[in-house]
Amino acid sequence: MQLTNPNRDRKAVVIFSGGQDSTTCLFQAIQDYGVENVEVVTFQYGQRHAIELEKAKWIAQDLGVKQTLIDTSVIKAITQNALMDEQARIEQHGSTPNTFVDGRNALFLLYTAIYAKGQGIQDIITGVCETDFSGYPDCRDVFIKSMNVTLNLAMDYQFHLKTPLMYLTKAQTWQLADELGVLDYIRQHTHTCYMGVEQGCGECPSCVLREKGLREYLSSKSEAEIDV
């Protein structure tokens, strides 16, 4: 994997949870910008799967990128959802799962933009995805584009919000990881489970989507190899 940036005048910050999607984005950013030009921002917001914070810290250190941890746990006092309530059952409520955290991605993008401007960084990368967005309205492309305009106007600064996974299925995200040469790394070191089970519970929506995508990708890869 290329670790030097052909455009050394640009830097990027990745919104980083230590999960499959954001770690894939981080590896792509390292390839595109160079490891010396990439930082990550991680958020502690009272998530029940706090093990992701440990994973994020370990991965950032392992890859040699600067990590900034931002505490936004105040959100836990003003909204309720199954992602922050350890006693709540994870289930679907209408078209939106009860794991949806109102305002989370808007808050993450705002805080990251504030940090990025202070560092002279314009490119902000987030792993949100519309194809497998699970009913989360703040994972849609229309939201990201709207937020990009809002942040630019609010801070009189030219941010570029980048969403490399926006139109990829989970299987295609696994394919991207494989193309980057980090499929096994993503499988072994990232955390996705909403329940906070280190190797995954295999039952929550996030685990199901991750495993389904992996099976689909490995199956299609195997078929392609047979056809060659």
From Swiss-Prot:
Binds 1 zinc ion per subunit. Transmembrane segments: none annotated. Pathway: Purine metabolism; 7-cyano-7-deazaguanine biosynthesis. Its cofactor is Zn(2+). GO terms for biological process: queuosine biosynthetic process. GO terms for molecular function: ATP binding; ligase activity, forming carbon-nitrogen bonds; zinc ion binding. Its EC number is 6.3.4.20. Keywords: ATP-binding, Ligase, Metal-binding, Nucleotide-binding, Queuosine biosynthesis, Zinc. The keyword tRNA-binding does not apply. The keyword Oxidoreductase does not apply. Pfam families: QueC. ATP binds at F16, S17, G18, G19, Q20, D21, S22, T23, T24, C25, L26. Zn(2+) binds at C193, C201, C204, C207. Coiled coil: none annotated. InterPro entries: QueC (IPR018317), Rossmann-like_a/b/a_fold (IPR014729). SUPFAM superfamilies: Adenine nucleotide alpha hydrolases-like (SSF52402). Catalyzes the ATP-dependent conversion of 7-carboxy-7-deazaguanine (CDG) to 7-cyano-7-deazaguanine (preQ(0)). NCBIfam families: 7-cyano-7-deazaguanine synthase QueC. HAMAP family: QueC. Belongs to the QueC family. This is 7-cyano-7-deazaguanine synthase. It comes from Pasteurella multocida (strain Pm70).
